[in-house]
Amino acid sequence: MEQEQKATQEQATYEEWTAPEPQEEKAEERGGNEPQEENAENLQQENTQAQQEALEEQPKAEQEQNDELAAANAKNCRTRSEDKRNGNRYLRLYADFENFRRRTRQEMEAAEKYRAQSLVSDLLPALDNFERALKIETENEQAKSILQGMEMVYRSVLDALKKEGVEAIEAVGKPFDPHLHQAVMQVEDSNYEPNTVVEEFQKGYKLKDRVIRPAMVKVSQ
């Protein structure tokens, strides 16, 4: 009998000692699952929010990209326009420089070519006087000798001027040329074609291809 009571007490003690353990495990299991579910919900919410923010940021990013592209295109257009203006400005400056250099060269060549023009212009009145004097006819031997000396001087001056490119303009018998001749009279003359120089009153001269003084002439009608 005592053995049965002892066994019954031991069994009760064992049950009291072992009974709470399953309840604690269940509590632990319940307590362990709740945070996991909460974490999953939070993660899903974060993903959803991130997707929404990404969708919201996408138009902004596209707009910023479009703005940057438009700004780059505008800058490129300004650069091309400025390059074109600079190119045109360079071409104008280059053309102006070339024109200046050409004019300078022409002026220097003209100055060298016609350097005797001033001297020739000053000598023309003296040549006219020589020509008028040499037309004088005289029987006086002394006067003839003087005229011969004057003619020698006159020829020497003409030779010197010829070396510088000075020559008399042909007039009598030539068609009238307003660039070479100055008509002071017109006459009817059957011996000449109309508009032909029939008489020269004063010699004309030119230096190379430049007329220093036109010939003063009479022209047939």
Swiss-Prot record:
Query: Which Pfam families does the record match to this protein?
Result: GrpE
Q: What is its main location?
A: cytoplasm
Stretches the record annotates as Disordered: 1-83
Listed GO molecular functions? adenyl-nucleotide exchange factor activity; protein homodimerization activity; protein-folding chaperone binding; unfolded protein binding
What UniProt keywords are attached to this protein's entry?
Answer: Chaperone, Cytoplasm, Stress response
Its GO biological process annotations read: protein folding
Residue ranges with Low complexity bias: 41-53
Q: Which CDD domains match?
A: GrpE
Annotated GO CC locations = cytoplasm
Enumerate the subcellular locations listed in this protein's record, separating them with semicolons.
Cytoplasm
In this chain, composition skew of type Basic and acidic residues spans: 23-32
Quote the subunit structure annotation: Homodimer.
Q: What does this protein do?
A: Participates actively in the response to hyperosmotic and heat shock by preventing the aggregation of stress-denatured proteins, in association with DnaK and GrpE. It is the nucleotide exchange factor for DnaK and may function as a thermosensor. Unfolded proteins bind initially to DnaJ; upon interaction with the DnaJ-bound protein, DnaK hydrolyzes its bound ATP, resulting in the formation of a stable complex. GrpE releases ADP from DnaK; ATP binding to DnaK triggers the release of the substrate protein, thus completing the reaction cycle.
Extract the HAMAP family matched here: GrpE
Q: Which family does it belong to?
A: Belongs to the GrpE family.
State the protein's name.
Protein GrpE
Q: Which organism is it from?
A: Geobacillus stearothermophilus
Which lineage ranks, top first, belong to the organism behind this chain?
Bacteria, Bacillati, Bacillota, Bacilli, Bacillales
What gene does the UniProt entry assign to this protein? grpE
